[in-house]
């Protein structure tokens, strides 16, 4: 809401009267992080972690209003490089912005809080009123309200605000325990659970029936495209837990969520209120949407709210131990703090992935870019499609669940559908004329489930009526209304989506020439960046050109299914013509495109060679 500046006197933040349009997301920096980055070699400070000494914005470190250091690079097992900031004196000589040997003063928390109390009071009152007004509007229409609690800074503030806005008996708190949280997060959860129970507030922990190690081995490592982990380990267990608590399979509730618009490009498009965006069939309110991290931290200090020690160790977010949406220096800080726990997951990646450069694949985040089951050891397709003699055949060598149960969810099965058990497995067929139709898509989704379903229970959570159960095996109630929400998942089944192989099986590559004679041109890329999603609806490229260019955009992770990606938006912000942006794009291409990978593997560095040689 408010913009901020740095207060030289207190060493803290100072909210201004201006409304913030963009925040650099400041966070406090404690002694543990200073030591980790090697700043103890240059400046003196007490080895205490109760009060911060500096603030960090992205890669920059600010001490009492002056940028004194910055870091570059960093990866899972590679520390970022620390660079001290120099300033030029009048005589032209460069000196350290903060002289070596300086004794750092801790932030004066009480003074900082006092100087911000009026602005914080306004922010608090506005947010509390929004929460109460929302509750008042829906309290007679919904079965429950709950706070989605993660143990991070935003959810700690959110819970405090909801406590101030609503009667203690009117809501519950639900912690979505992925089983992959920081150990420091579990300490915060224990602490908050005890406080809630003392205050008469229901507190529940929701956890998947899968152990994370088992789900990683079942699905393969998650990635920024294959984000099965959030559904399997977070959203679905929360829905199922609330059904259990309320003893109502078709409950409709509202959750208070601590997302903020300034956290990421994607979240910048979130709305205050929504229906079905976070969890199908449920309402959500994002009370902190317009808060900046400056206001979050000031509110925490002003109200002496608990701070997850993960932040004191350099982590900007308190999430999962190894997240496909992370990478870079964030991975370094995580590993430095929780190395043994994280190594369990990196060892699992090594166990599962078939890559000759597996160490680089792990440490540089190649696993983050996984897009199918191609590189998973021993992965053989359990679903095969072929068109023959006027029919589309779906062949399932080893069915995992009953096709007749899943077929209950389909309103109008095609009259041409025929299913039989053959020696090669379960074989279903429909008329080939239906292949590109909506009904064929639905039938395929059902047989994806038949072939791959691992009882992750996401379909069960998606059913708004509670008509799907996996107790003792798959069972779909005959009262199913055939709404199709159980199929509103990527490819109808998360496990199929994660393990499916490319159409050619992903192993035999006929040619390295992945772009035929239509390598991407500057004009195409410029047009794509200027027009975004609109580019796919109207462009000047021919059929083969657009096909090859889509391959390029997909391999570079700039677009997927005719939609620009968050990575594209990031490179656009950096400046798509810059070396930095193209360096990032090249990294993606190396992992995904065999032609680019071949160049990297076979061409010597810093040498010119004729095209004919290549």
Predicted features by range, described:
Residues 1-148, 153-447, 498-503:
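Nucleotide-activated chemistry modules centered on ATP-dependent adenylation/adenylyltransferase
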Residues 118, 314, 450, 477, ...:
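Short, solvent-exposed segments of well-ordered alpha helices
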Residues 182, 306-307, 476-477, 562-572:
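Residue-level signal for threonine
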Residues 312-315, 469-483:
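Short linker/helix segments within small regulatory modules
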Residues 317-332, 453-459, 483-486, 493:
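Cysteine-cluster motifs in flexible loop/terminal segments that predominantly coordinate metals
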Residues 446-464:
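C-terminal accessory/binding modules appended to enzymatic or scaffolding proteins
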Residues 458-474, 485-501:
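Iron-sulfur cluster-binding cysteine motifs and their immediate structural context
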Residues 503-614:
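Donor-sugar nucleotide-binding helix/loop cap in glycosyltransferases
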């Amino acid at each position: 809401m408010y913009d901020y500046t740095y207060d030289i006197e207190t060493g803290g933040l100072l909210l201004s009267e201006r409304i913030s349009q963009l925040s650099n997301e400041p966070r406090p920096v404690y002694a543990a992080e200073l030591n980790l980055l090697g700043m103890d070699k240059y400046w003196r400070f007490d080895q205490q972690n109760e009060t911060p000494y500096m603030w960090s914005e992205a890669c920059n470190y600010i001490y009492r209003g002056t940028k004194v250091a910055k870091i570059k690079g960093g990866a899972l097992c590679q520390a970022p490089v620390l660079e001290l900031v120099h300033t030029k004196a009048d005589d032209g000589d460069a000196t350290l912005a903060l002289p070596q040997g300086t004794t750092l003063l801790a932030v004066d928390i009480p003074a900082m809080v006092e100087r911000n109390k009026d602005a914080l009071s306004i922010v608090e009152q506005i947010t509390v009123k929004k929460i109460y007004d929302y509750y008042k509007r829906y309290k007679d229409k919904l079965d429950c309200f709950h706070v989605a609690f993660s143990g991070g800074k935003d959810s700690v503030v959110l819970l405090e605000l909801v406590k101030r806005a609503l009667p203690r008996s009117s809501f519950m708190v639900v912690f979505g325990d992925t089983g992959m949280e920081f150990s420091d997060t579990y300490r915060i959860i224990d602490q908050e659970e005890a406080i809630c129970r003392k205050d008469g507030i229901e507190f529940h922990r929701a956890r998947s029936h899968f152990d994370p190690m088992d789900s990683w081995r079942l699905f393969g490592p998650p990635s920024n495209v294959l984000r099965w982990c959030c559904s399997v380990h977070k959203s679905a267990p929360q829905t199922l837990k609330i059904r259990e608590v309320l003893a109502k399979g078709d409950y409709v509730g509202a959750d208070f969520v601590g997302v903020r618009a300034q956290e990421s490009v994607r979240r910048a498009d979130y709305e205050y209120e929504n229906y079905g965006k976070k969890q199908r069939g449920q309402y959500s309110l994002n009370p902190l949407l317009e808060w900046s991290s400056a206001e979050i931290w000031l509110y925490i200090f002003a109200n002496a709210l608990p701070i997850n020690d993960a932040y004191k160790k350099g982590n900007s977010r308190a999430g999962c131990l190894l997240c496909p949406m992370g990478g870079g220096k964030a991975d370094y800080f995580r590993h430095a703090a929780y190395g043994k726990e994280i190594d369990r997951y990196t060892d699992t990646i090594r166990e599962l992935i078939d890559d000759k450069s597996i160490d680089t694949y792990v440490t540089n985040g190649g696993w983050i870019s996984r897009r199918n089951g191609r590189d998973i050891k021993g992965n053989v397709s359990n679903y095969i499609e072929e068109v023959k003699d006027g029919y589309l055949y779906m062949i399932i060598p080893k069915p995992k669940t009953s096709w007749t149960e899943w077929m209950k969810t389909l309103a109008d099965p095609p009259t041409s559908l025929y299913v039989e058990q053959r020696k090669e497995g379960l074989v279903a067929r429909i008329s080939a004329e239906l292949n590109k139709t909506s009904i064929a898509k639905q039938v395929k989704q059902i047989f994806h489930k038949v072939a791959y379903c691992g009882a992750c229970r996401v379909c069960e959570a998606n059913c708004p009526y509670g008509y799907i159960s996996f107790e003792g095996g798959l069972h779909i109630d005959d009262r199913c209304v055939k709404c199709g929400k159980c199929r509103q998942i990527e490819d109808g089944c998360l496990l199929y989506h994660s393990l499916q192989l490319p159409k050619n099986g992903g192993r035999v590559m006929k040619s390295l020439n992945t772009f035929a004679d239509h390598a991407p041109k500057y004009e195409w890329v410029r047009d794509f960046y200027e027009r975004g999603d609109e580019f796919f609806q109207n462009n000047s490229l021919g059929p083969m050109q657009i096909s090859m260019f889509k391959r390029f955009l997909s391999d570079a992770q700039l677009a997927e299914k005719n939609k620009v990606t968050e990575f594209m938006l990031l490179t656009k912000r950096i400046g798509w013509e810059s070396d930095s942006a193209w360096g990032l794009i090249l990294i993606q291409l190396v992992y995904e495109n065999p032609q680019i990978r071949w160049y990297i593997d076979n061409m010597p560095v810093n040498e010119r060679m004729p095209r004919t040689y290549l």
